[in-house]
Amino acid sequence: MSLNLPPEEFSAWMRLSLEPGLGQAQARRLLLEAGLPQNIYAMAAGSLARLVPPELAQRLAAEPTPDILEATARTLEWLSGPNHHIVTLADPAYPKALLDIHDPPLMLYVIGNVDLLASPVISMVGARNASVGGVDNALAFAHYLAEQGWCIASGLALGIDAAAHKGALRAGAQGGGTMAILGTGIDIVYPSRNRDLAHQIAEQGVLVSEF
């Protein structure tokens, strides 16, 4: 488990990421104004209405909904799993490259070696229905680059993605590791036939999702 946040701050980050009708750009604007997420929920509706629409300001000033409380409790339970982490936008472990994109996620759900988020990364992606030669090349390139200290990032899809992860894992503990960026929730492996690969990445690399 990794939760290097006071309970109040953790709950506020969760609510901020789950608040209906609150976009990530609006959430970042609120954070710039308030500093910490729990400070947002200490603001009066009138003050919040200067930053977001009045209806949303009223919701932010009210108590969290039962759905948000339930989701927060589930996430806290999820964090009890081995090497399960939450990395917020304000966390030093948050990937620096993500901070440069237009709409960085407020929170990342992570399973595995969180230190890899700060590693030099090379992304490898390609066809799901790849040729034998393409798969072999992806395995070889990823293996070589991982041996040189690069963390190989891909999407855990069939074909080239899976080959890139496998090639990086072949470099072993002395290699740069591999990072699987998931388009699903952190607890959902898609495609399911890559479940064993996902477990191996969780043990020897890192799985990352914003969901």
Regions found by a protein language model. Give the residues of each.
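Glycine-biased, small-residue-rich flexible motifs in mid-sequence functional cores and linkers
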Residues: 2-9, 88-211
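Short, small/acidic-rich helices and loops at N termini and domain boundaries
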Residues: 1-93
